């Protein structure tokens, strides 16, 4: 049986085009947004609708602000975004209820995960790929140390239609200790 074919107008297709110069970046809306080591700008390119039933530790992977502003507003089983950060910056340890794949576009990035109480790390460069399964505590950080003032870009792809992010108990404890969350 052949796959169904649809026709779309140029205007309909334009709603599915995201020009980077037109995408608004956000630096808030996540539990760790005000932590000095977690400062970053997130761009919601495809999908990332707000998840149902969030609490302080559970949120959209792009944060509340960016989740409201997808450049391409679809729910078709995956979400795509970018993170821009300076060296030493990136999210605190967290997990997702779906797969998350990281692809550095520029710079060097450390991608870490927690196993048996310690962090393991791979350092990736442009166009390298790492794919974390659901439930693995993970984080990433710009590691382009030879360019201390430069922001670099990482693409991330997350499965599902309304994926959730949850910060680790240690991350939430540190955020509470700093007075950044209740």
Predicted regions and their residues:
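Short histidine-centered beta-strand/loop micro-motifs
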Residues: 68-73, 91-96, 113, 121-123, ...
């Amino acid at each position: 049986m052949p796959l169904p074919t649809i026709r779309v107008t140029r205007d309909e297709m334009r709603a599915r085009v995201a020009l980077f110069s037109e995408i608004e970046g956000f630096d808030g809306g996540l539990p760790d947004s005000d932590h000095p080591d977690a400062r970053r700008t997130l761009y919601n390119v495809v999908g990332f609708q707000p998840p149902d039933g969030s609490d302080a530790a559970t949120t959209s992977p792009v944060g509340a602000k960016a989740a409201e502003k997808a450049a391409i507003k679809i729910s078709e089983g995956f979400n795509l975004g970018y993170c821009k950060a300076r060296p030493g910056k990136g999210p605190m340890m967290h997990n997702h209820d779906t797969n998350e794949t990281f692809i550095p576009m520029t710079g060097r990035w450390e991608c870490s995960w927690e196993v048996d109480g310690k962090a393991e790390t791979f350092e990736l460069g442009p166009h390298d790929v790492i794919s974390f399964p659901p439930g693995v505590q993970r984080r990433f950080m710009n590691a382009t140390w030879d360019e201390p003032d430069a922001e670099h870009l990482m693409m991330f792809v997350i499965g599902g239609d309304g994926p959730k992010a949850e910060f680790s108990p240690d991350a939430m404890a540190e955020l509470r200790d700093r007075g950044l969350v209740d």
